[in-house]
């Protein structure tokens, strides 16, 4: 499998090193924005720069042709602002520890179900599905600390990400993590609008809980599979909103 086929980076460490140099904003951010200090995801810069360049071109058009260009300029400004909102990447802190499975994505819980997971866990697992709308933060995070043992891309369809069949049929990237409490699988799933999954992961790599996993561009879903044998209690319900790196999805029982 070639990394270019699915956006899985073979240069994840260099991307993370460059990403660490991007400064945070220095002012408090409202909750709807994502909470905490915020920076832009590196993958978003080409889109944001292009969006604002078009908005600037529209402003020039207004200056040259007058009010007839106002509708176009307003539309371009709306798109430019939305691109900044979409690619925001808030700094997140929350509960940490090997007994917790933390949300890997912002969004709404659309499904909690026990399913068979044959790819990595090869056992019954509780699947917790998070749907991200185009207004949610789309940077994904590791739900637990551990070592990456599996990295697999599967091409597929582009059904609506909230649909039940999306977990099986849509384009997706799966990351299997060996944690202190056993194996855990997290799956990035493309949606109706999303056409690009980026996963900064390498087999054998050690990752921290809440570290950056990647991003899915323009509306998507993330599933977490927790082995039933691990005796983890689910702490969220369908319809609940969660935040990546902050919300506890499941907690291992003593």
What are these regions (language model features)?
Residues 1-30:
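Short, basic, low-complexity termini and linkers enriched in Ser/Thr/Gly/Pro
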Residues 32-254:
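Contiguous, well-folded functional domains in the mature portion of proteins
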């Amino acid at each position: 499998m070639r990394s270019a086929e699915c956006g899985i980076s073979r240069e994840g460490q260099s991307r993370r090193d460059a990403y660490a140099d991007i400064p945070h904003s220095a002012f408090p951010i409202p909750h709807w924005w994502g909470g905490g200090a915020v920076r832009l995801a590196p993958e978003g810069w080409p889109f944001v720069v292009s969006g604002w360049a078009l908005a600037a071109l529209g402003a020039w058009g207004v200056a040259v042709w007058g009010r007839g260009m106002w509708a176009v300029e307003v539309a371009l400004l709306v798109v430019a602002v939305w691109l900044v909102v979409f690619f925001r990447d808030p700094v997140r802190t929350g509960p940490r520890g090997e007994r917790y499975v933390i949300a890997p994505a912002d969004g709404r819980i659309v499904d909690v179900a026990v399913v068979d997971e044959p790819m990595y866990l090869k056992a019954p697992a509780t699947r917790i599905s998070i749907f991200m709308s185009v207004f949610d933060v789309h940077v994904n995070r590791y739900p637990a600390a551990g070592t990456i043992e599996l990295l697999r891309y599967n091409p597929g369809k582009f059904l609506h990400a909230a649909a039940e069949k999306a977990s099986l049929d849509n384009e997706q990237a799966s990351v299997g993590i060996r944690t202190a409490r056993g194996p855990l699988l997290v799956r990035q799933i493309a949606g109706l609008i999303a056409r690009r999954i980026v996963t900064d992961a390498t087999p054998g790599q050690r990752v921290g809980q809440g570290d950056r996993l990647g991003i899915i561009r323009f509306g998507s879903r993330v599933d977490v599979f927790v082995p039933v044998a691990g005796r983890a209690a689910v702490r969220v319900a369908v319809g609940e909103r969660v935040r990546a790196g902050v919300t506890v999805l499941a907690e291992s029982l003593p």
